[in-house]
Amino acid sequence: EPLSVAVHATVAQGRVSALQNVLVLGAGPVGLLVAAVARAYGARRVVCVDLVDEKLAFAQSFCATSTFKPSLPQQDESDSECARRNALALLDSLGGDVKENDGFDLALDATGAQPCVQLAAWAMRPRGRIVLIGMGRPEIHVPITRLLVREVEVLGSFRYAAGDYDRSIALASLGMIDVTRIVTHRYVFSDAEKAFDATTAGRGDDGRVCIKVQICQGAAAA
């Protein structure tokens, strides 16, 4: 099911294509699968953004061509100013065609967080496309002039639609995406409360960062 969400956002809404440069905001289960779908469809670069080092390390090993950890706002700096500064730092660090094209072709936000949406807006090339997947606050501020002047397309993506499950099954069955890798913690049904606690805390009893927690029957595997 999460893979179908990623396929719908990346393929149906984002219309990802080969050799594009793709920015993914958020390295949770959906963000990671979005990045994996982009790679499977031939994206040249897939850059994952997150604040958690362990998630970025996982993204690098799973699907990302590179990762980026944005800095927090400086004193008296607004979220949008911080996002602009981070976007410039990201483009400078990547160089190559991303900088030459003045931004990414496609950005997909899996967080719903205002700073991430703003970062996407500042990191887009002219006539790029942003797909919003994550649900955060019902209202956020975006640099609308930046989007208008650059004619950036902004689309929403909600769950999945006809054909997305078929595409997801094909990607998994052909070995193009190993969905089992994002399941970092497994719990038996009798330990369901521990599973929810780990999800809430973001870490399991073993101290590792949780990407995807699974509750299953039978013996649990760490």
Label the model's feature ranges.
Residues 1-77:
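Mid-domain Rossmann-like dinucleotide-binding core that forms the NAD(H)/NADP(H) cofactor-binding site
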Residues 17, 112, 125, 204:
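Short conserved AdoMet
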Residues 19, 64, 103-104, 192:
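Local beta-strand N-terminus motif with an aromatic residue
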Residues 29-34, 113-119:
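Short glycine/serine/threonine-rich phosphate/pyrophosphate-binding segments
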Residues 69, 114-174, 181, 214-222:
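Glycine-rich phosphate-binding loop and adjacent beta-alpha segment
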Residues 73-101:
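Short amphipathic alpha-helix with an adjacent loop that forms part of the alpha/beta core around
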Residues 97, 101, 136, 177-182, ...:
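C-terminal capping/lid region of NAD(P)-dependent oxidoreductase domains
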Residues 105-108, 131:
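N-terminal Rossmann-like NAD(P) cofactor-binding module of classical short-chain dehydrogenase/reductase
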